[in-house]
């Protein structure tokens, strides 16, 4: 593994975690939005398997465009819909009520997404730390090469 591939792997991780954070932030922002369905980011190791192969092993969900990255490392392969149904409440005067007077609430659990966002943030920080270490290693190698 070269130093440049270490940078590429960490950059792929930064990109994947950034995209994950956007999904979690969107979920949290829509916690109170009726009919909103929680999105689940799918982050995979960068392999030769297609997203379709990976998702076939998981729950059926909504496939959206995702992030790809040429280096080894993590890739956000896509986003799938959480199949958990939202709670229905009877509110016939609500403008979004169905013909029977029910409104389906969002299926987002804000605590779950906050915990996932914190985990994502820590993974992002870890990738930044790796970049810092690799940068220091490269600088030390240059110093050794200069004879000092």
Summary of predicted features, one role per range:
Residues 1-148:
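Amphipathic alpha-helical polymerization modules
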């Amino acid at each position: 593994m070269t130093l440049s591939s270490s940078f590429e792997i960490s950059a792929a991780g930064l990109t994947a975690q950034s995209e994950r954070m956007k999904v979690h932030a969107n979920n949290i922002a829509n916690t109170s939005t009726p009919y909103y369905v929680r999105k689940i980011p799918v982050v995979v190791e960068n392999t030769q398997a297609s997203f379709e192969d990976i998702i076939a092993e998981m729950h059926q969900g909504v496939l959206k465009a995702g992030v790809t990255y040429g280096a080894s490392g993590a890739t956000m392969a896509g986003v799938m819909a959480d199949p958990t149904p939202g709670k229905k409440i009877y509110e016939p005067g609500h403008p979004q009520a169905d013909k029977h007077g029910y409104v389906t609430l969002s299926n987002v659990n804000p605590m779950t997404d906050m915990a996932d966002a914190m985990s994502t943030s820590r993974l992002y920080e870890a990738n930044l730390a790796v970049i810092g270490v690799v940068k220091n290693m490269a600088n030390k190698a240059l110093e050794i090469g200069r004879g000092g």
